[in-house]
């Protein structure tokens, strides 16, 4: 039975992964989804970026997740999640998020609930005019995150022409609708210097209680 290790990566390791894997993964038509190396360095310098890697017992990197966080590190936004090509088709993503949850809960208990991770935001592409293939992929992603406890909120970012739905995966707290919006905005107001009018960027998607659909 394999023993897995999940750990937070250093600045040097993050930049190495960016060059070795992210640039290749998004090469071609998806390049617009990849932020620049300068942006990664900017986020790291301001402590607004964290990256975790899942390793097997032979220290092979299986997958990694790059997250953007607010200054207080109360919430994180999943920016990129990559499973290395030769390790795809296994349950490593589930193991990654389960171990990340366990790690965050343990840290909260040790810190007496001070500076704890409340949960993780996940942006999922809106349906729009998706092809049948893309729609099927989106549905599988949605089902994956739902199995981990995530749910669709009533937040829709309008930072570009692309529409996104925002999911929230509770870790140490289940937030109200107002708290969700406040925490989501806390992330973006740090990474968008011109972020001033929240109404310009956030609009209501549904009137369902607590953002559940």
Predicted feature locations:
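A conserved beta-turn-beta hairpin within the catalytic core of GNAT-like acetyltransferases
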Residues: 70-78, 88, 114-118
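Residue-level detector of beta-propeller blades
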Residues: 8, 60-61, 151-152
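Conserved beta-strand in the GNAT
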Residues: 53, 59-69, 75-82
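Conserved acetyl-CoA-binding loop-helix of GNAT-fold acetyltransferases
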Residues: 83, 89-108
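A short helix-loop-beta-strand connector motif used in the catalytic cores of GNAT acetyltransferases and
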Residues: 41-53, 63
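Short amphipathic alpha-helix that is part of the acyltransferase structural core
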Residues: 1-39, 55
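Feature marks short, surface-exposed loop/turn motifs that line or immediately flank catalytic pockets
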Residues: 71, 85, 128
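Terminal substrate-recognition subdomain of acyl/acetyltransferases
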Residues: 1-2, 109-213
């Amino acid at each position: 039975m394999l023993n897995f290790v999940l750990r937070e990566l250093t600045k040097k390791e993050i930049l190495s992964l960016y060059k070795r894997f992210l640039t290749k993964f998004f090469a071609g038509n998806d390049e617009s989804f990849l932020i620049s190396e300068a942006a990664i360095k900017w986020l790291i310098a301001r402590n607004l970026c964290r990256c975790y890697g899942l390793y097997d017992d032979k220290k092979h990197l299986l997958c990694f997740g790059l997250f953007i966080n607010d200054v207080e590190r109360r919430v994180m936004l999943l920016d990129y999640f990559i499973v290395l090509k030769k390790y795809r088709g296994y349950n490593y993503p589930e193991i990654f998020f389960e171990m990340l949850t366990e790690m965050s809960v343990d840290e909260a208990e040790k810190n007496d609930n001070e500076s704890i991770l409340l949960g993780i935001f996940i942006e999922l592409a809106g349906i729009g005019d998706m092809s049948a293939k893309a729609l099927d992929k989106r549905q599988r992603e949605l089902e994956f995150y739902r199995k981990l406890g995530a749910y669709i909120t009533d937040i829709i970012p309008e930072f570009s022409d692309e529409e996104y739905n925002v999911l929230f995966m509770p870790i140490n707290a289940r937030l109200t609708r107002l708290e969700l919006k406040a925490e989501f905005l806390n992330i973006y107001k740090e990474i968008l210097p011109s972020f001033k009018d929240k109404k310009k960027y956030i609009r209501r998607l549904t009137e369902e209680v607590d953002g559940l659909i």
